[in-house]
Amino acid sequence: MIGLVQRVAHACAKVNGEVIGSIDEGLLVLLAVEPDDTERKAERLLDRISGYRIFADPNGKMNLSLKDVGGELLVVSQFTLAADTKKGMRPSFSSAASPELGERLYDHFVEKASALLSRVQTGRFGAEMEITLTNIGPTTFSLRVE
């Protein structure tokens, strides 16, 4: 399971021009599910993301987590992160989970995140979305749980 984590001042997900998820200070997570992923892997990735110390402490050092700062979370499904781009001029998506598994584990991740954090917003699984964000830093990390 892959999470592309971006520290944001604001992020928003729209479908057909309608805002379906929006946050202020926090993390935008683009989430990709791979064929061998499990609920346990989703929970491990959530633990890493929510505890990852990428927010500044009073001394300006990256020393605080999303939980520490009471930040918000926007989770967006992004199967293209699992693409195989090693050869050719077109990505292969055979390394992405089936839509059924992807949606089940995406929903599990969101459910667990909602129980752990005070404000969780989502995109819409499988939808064509417009994502806007203001990245702070920019600060972006790719986290993977195998």
From Swiss-Prot:
Catalysis: reaction(s): glycyl-tRNA(Ala) + H2O = tRNA(Ala) + glycine + H(+); a D-aminoacyl-tRNA + H2O = a tRNA + a D-alpha-amino acid + H(+)
Motif (Gly-cisPro motif, important for rejection of L-amino acids): 137-138
UniProt EC number: 3.1.1.96
Principal EC category: hydrolase
Top-level taxon in the UniProt lineage: Bacteria
Compartment list: Cytoplasm
Pfam families according to UniProt: Tyr_Deacylase
Cellular component GO terms held in the UniProt record: cytoplasm
Record's keyword annotation contains Transferase: no
Keyword Cytoplasm carried by entry: yes
GO MF annotations in UniProt: D-tyrosyl-tRNA(Tyr) deacylase activity; Gly-tRNA(Ala) deacylase activity; Ser(Gly)-tRNA(Ala) hydrolase activity; tRNA binding
Main location: cytoplasm
Domain remark from Swiss-Prot or TrEMBL: A Gly-cisPro motif from one monomer fits into the active site of the other monomer to allow specific chiral rejection of L-amino acids.
PANTHER family cross-referenced by the UniProt entry: D-AMINOACYL-TRNA DEACYLASE 1, D-TYROSYL-TRNA TYR DEACYLASE
Cross-referenced HAMAP family: Deacylase_Dtd
Family indicated by similarity: Belongs to the DTD family.
Protein name: D-aminoacyl-tRNA deacylase
Lineage: Bacteria, Pseudomonadati, Pseudomonadota, Gammaproteobacteria, Oceanospirillales
Encoding gene per record: dtd
